[in-house]
Every structure is written in C-alpha cells, then in structure tokens.
C-alpha cells in the first residue's frame, strides 16, 4: 500500500492563546512548515499560525 499524500496538521497561534486550526497539506509538494495569518478569537486580531504535529 502506498503512503498517503496528504497529512493532517495543526496550526497553532503564535500569540500563545492556545487557539489552533486543523487542516491538511500535501507532504510531497509542501515540505517546509506552513505559516499563515489567521484570526485568533481570544486575542481578537489576526496573528501568525505555525504548523505543529497533531499528537
């Protein structure tokens, strides 16, 4: 059986509020860590969310 191309990842807020989004990425084409600006409802502003592993 072949390895799956997409993996689930967690995007954790850089504002240290504990807010995270769960999304998926293609691990074959996107080898570097994802950094996105998304809304943090606890901080009530847009902050950077960095990719971490789902435990």
UniProtKB/Swiss-Prot annotation:
PROSITE patterns: RIBOSOMAL_L33. GO terms for biological process: translation. Disulfide bonds: none annotated. InterPro entries: Ribosomal_bL33, Ribosomal_bL33_CS, Ribosomal_bL33_sf, Ribosomal_zn-bd. Keywords: Ribonucleoprotein, Ribosomal protein. One of its GO terms (molecular function) is structural constituent of ribosome. The keyword Ribonucleoprotein applies. GO terms for cellular component: cytosolic large ribosomal subunit. The keyword Ribosomal protein applies. Belongs to the bacterial ribosomal protein bL33 family. This is Large ribosomal subunit protein bL33. It comes from Azorhizobium caulinodans (strain ATCC 43989 / DSM 5975 / JCM 20966 / LMG 6465 / NBRC 14845 / NCIMB 13405 / ORS 571). The gene is rpmG.
